[in-house]
Amino acid sequence: MAFPHRPDAPELPDFSMLKRLARDQLIYLLEQLPGKKDLFIEADLMSPLDRIANVSILKQHEVDKLYKVENKPALSSNEQLCFLVRPRIKNMRYIASLVNADKLAGRTRKYKVIFSPQKFYACEMVLEEEGIYGDVSCDEWAFSLLPLDVDLLSMELPEFFRDYFLEGDQRWINTVAQALHLLSTLYGPFPNCYGIGRCAKMAYELWRNLEEEEDGETKGRRPEIGHIFLLDRDVDFVTALCSQVVYEGLVDDTFRIKCGSVDFGPEVTSSDKSLKVLLNAEDKVFNEIRNEHFSNVFGFLSQKARNLQAQYDRRRGMDIKQMKNFVSQELKGLKQEHRLLSLHIGACESIMKKKTKQDFQELIKTEHALLEGFNIRESTSYIEEHIDRQVSPIESLRLMCLLSITENGLIPKDYRSLKTQYLQSYGPEHLLTFSNLRRAGLLTEQAPGDTLTAVESKVSKLVTDKAAGKITDAFSSLAKRSNFRAISKKLNLIPRVDGEYDLKVPRDMAYVFGGAYVPLSCRIIEQVLERRSWQGLDEVVRLLNCSDFAFTDMTKEDKASSESLRLILVVFLGGCTFSEISALRFLGREKGYRFIFLTTAVTNSARLMEAMSEVKA
């Protein structure tokens, strides 16, 4: 059921070293404040911290009590306070309020601020403005790479997407460069580098500068990873906006996977309690279904349950010695498998109930029509109905963005109509969100000259003038009216299928969207790796309106083993989806590669829309 790795598939590097490094550095920073201390942790850092150093480890290093950084007075009576925070101005104001309250009360304590993953000058300026810069000591916890799975690393920076792609804030690019530098220091240099997007290019150049400054560190080392590919999220918004239909993607869309784990509620656990479950390759049941199209999952779990029951039933014919062996060697594993199986069956049932209620099939049909460019009027009517029924502000916004990007912007009449209906249905407070979406290129209005009618009239005039040679040019400009359509055609993103697409035995990456669409980001990666360059993709790059780069260091490549040259690190700047991860895992199996994923954060369509929204849920 799961994609078995080919026998010749290369081994993955051991990324547990990154956890150990992060843990050791944090312990070192905590011990710089000897004695008992209270630790204030920002909410965003709680889940990543739990994966690195749990409460018992913190207690071993004299952390007395833990507090969440929030907008209310702290009740700590400890003489030493340590703050573990992101470099945000609101956090500096919070720390300043505590320190200044102590000053007013005539109380003297020791304060330490640990910034993660790095400190920014702006934060130090705020501490100075608040008059407490001399009262606190500042440090950095350079924790920027969290291994969520054997092949998935996350920087856990969901704000990267909004900060860079909406605000144009480049401060996190240095963090990305430092993370890449750490990887090349630990796992050897990367002989082949490719990338597309403005942010990717800046991160690459900054990283190369760091490499040149410390050239001695990786010199002479054998590369463990043969290729690195950097890609901006805005190169492919379409994939991120589509509903996910692979199991892991659906679990994320339905329950929200956070930092590699998910909270399953009572409707899944069949009890009155919620349960936090870690989703990774160690969960054997999950690992077999994570990359599968959802339509295959129930059948697999049913068969698994029958097999498990058969193993339990073997006990009946056992003698005492056999029973003893069974209890000591197999029973524990069977019970664990049974528990996991029950959870995933419960999750599937819950997903089915929610999706049936939402009329998921009709939604998928509309998305496929938008991707293929068919029945645009019907799809627009479906979106209008969605808005009128007030189904979900985020869902309606997502569908509007998908319509806009696949059609290279909405015609002015449709843009004004949909926007008016949306604001009337969900409230005028969403007006600023539309401004954000326009700035990010997610929801735009066509200029009058771009409309289909304008191009049609141009063609009509040429036909009347019998200017045969120019008719082809006019039709060509008509075809390129939507860059997505042109790119889709160039890269064959919409597979031509004779009969039913077999989701049980998929033949290409399109299976992650029910056979309707190959993720653009994944197709670009596939094409560049095949060519080992951007050669022959000039037209695609031009249509994407992005800068691309490729660099090969022959001396490093000569040192690399054939196995490491089949290991590819893909860096998503602005987030990647589980659908893209599943698609590239499939490609790896087909081509004999192994992909490793590094993302600023795992994302999905809802997170993308929430990042752009000015109305917080």
Curated annotation (Swiss-Prot):
<dbReference type="GO" id="GO:0048471">
    <property type="term" value="C:perinuclear region of cytoplasm"/>
</dbReference>
<dbReference type="GO" id="GO:0061025">
    <property type="term" value="P:membrane fusion"/>
</dbReference>
<dbReference type="GO" id="GO:0044877">
    <property type="term" value="F:protein-containing complex binding"/>
</dbReference>
<keyword id="KW-0977">Ichthyosis</keyword>
<dbReference type="InterPro" id="IPR001619">
    <property type="entry name" value="Sec1-like"/>
</dbReference>
<dbReference type="GO" id="GO:0032963">
    <property type="term" value="P:collagen metabolic process"/>
</dbReference>
<keyword id="KW-0813">Transport</keyword>
<dbReference type="GO" id="GO:0046907">
    <property type="term" value="P:intracellular transport"/>
</dbReference>
<comment type="function">
    <text>May play a role in vesicle-mediated protein trafficking to lysosomal compartments and in membrane docking/fusion reactions of late endosomes/lysosomes. Required for proper trafficking and targeting of the collagen-modifying enzyme lysyl hydroxylase 3 (LH3) to intracellular collagen. Mediates phagolysosomal fusion in macrophages. Proposed to be involved in endosomal maturation implicating VIPAS39. In epithelial cells, the VPS33B:VIPAS39 complex may play a role in the apical recycling pathway and in the maintenance of the apical-basolateral polarity.</text>
</comment>
<dbReference type="GO" id="GO:0033263">
    <property type="term" value="C:CORVET complex"/>
</dbReference>
<keyword id="KW-0209">Deafness</keyword>
<dbReference type="InterPro" id="IPR043127">
    <property type="entry name" value="Sec-1-like_dom3a"/>
</dbReference>
<keyword id="KW-0653">Protein transport</keyword>
<dbReference type="GO" id="GO:0010008">
    <property type="term" value="C:endosome membrane"/>
</dbReference>
<dbReference type="GO" id="GO:0006886">
    <property type="term" value="P:intracellular protein transport"/>
</dbReference>
<keyword id="KW-0225">Disease variant</keyword>
<dbReference type="GO" id="GO:0005794">
    <property type="term" value="C:Golgi apparatus"/>
</dbReference>
<dbReference type="GO" id="GO:0005764">
    <property type="term" value="C:lysosome"/>
</dbReference>
<comment type="subunit">
    <text>(Microbial infection) Interacts with M.tuberculosis PtpA.</text>
</comment>
<dbReference type="GO" id="GO:0035855">
    <property type="term" value="P:megakaryocyte development"/>
</dbReference>
<dbReference type="GO" id="GO:0090385">
    <property type="term" value="P:phagosome-lysosome fusion"/>
</dbReference>
<dbReference type="GO" id="GO:0043589">
    <property type="term" value="P:skin morphogenesis"/>
</dbReference>
<dbReference type="GO" id="GO:0007032">
    <property type="term" value="P:endosome organization"/>
</dbReference>
<dbReference type="GO" id="GO:0005770">
    <property type="term" value="C:late endosome"/>
</dbReference>
<dbReference type="GO" id="GO:0015031">
    <property type="term" value="P:protein transport"/>
</dbReference>
<dbReference type="GO" id="GO:0017185">
    <property type="term" value="P:peptidyl-lysine hydroxylation"/>
</dbReference>
<keyword id="KW-0988">Intrahepatic cholestasis</keyword>
<dbReference type="GO" id="GO:0005829">
    <property type="term" value="C:cytosol"/>
</dbReference>
<keyword id="KW-0967">Endosome</keyword>
<dbReference type="GO" id="GO:0030136">
    <property type="term" value="C:clathrin-coated vesicle"/>
</dbReference>
<keyword id="KW-0007">Acetylation</keyword>
<keyword id="KW-0458">Lysosome</keyword>
<keyword id="KW-0968">Cytoplasmic vesicle</keyword>
<dbReference type="GO" id="GO:0099023">
    <property type="term" value="C:vesicle tethering complex"/>
</dbReference>
<dbReference type="GO" id="GO:0031091">
    <property type="term" value="C:platelet alpha granule"/>
</dbReference>
<dbReference type="GO" id="GO:0005768">
    <property type="term" value="C:endosome"/>
</dbReference>
<dbReference type="InterPro" id="IPR036045">
    <property type="entry name" value="Sec1-like_sf"/>
</dbReference>
<keyword id="KW-1007">Palmoplantar keratoderma</keyword>
<comment type="subunit">
    <text>Interacts with RAB11A and VIPAS39. Interacts with RAB25. Associates with adapter protein complex 3 (AP-3), clathrin:AP-3 and clathrin:HGS complexes.</text>
</comment>
<dbReference type="GO" id="GO:0055037">
    <property type="term" value="C:recycling endosome"/>
</dbReference>
<dbReference type="GO" id="GO:0005737">
    <property type="term" value="C:cytoplasm"/>
</dbReference>
<dbReference type="GO" id="GO:0031902">
    <property type="term" value="C:late endosome membrane"/>
</dbReference>
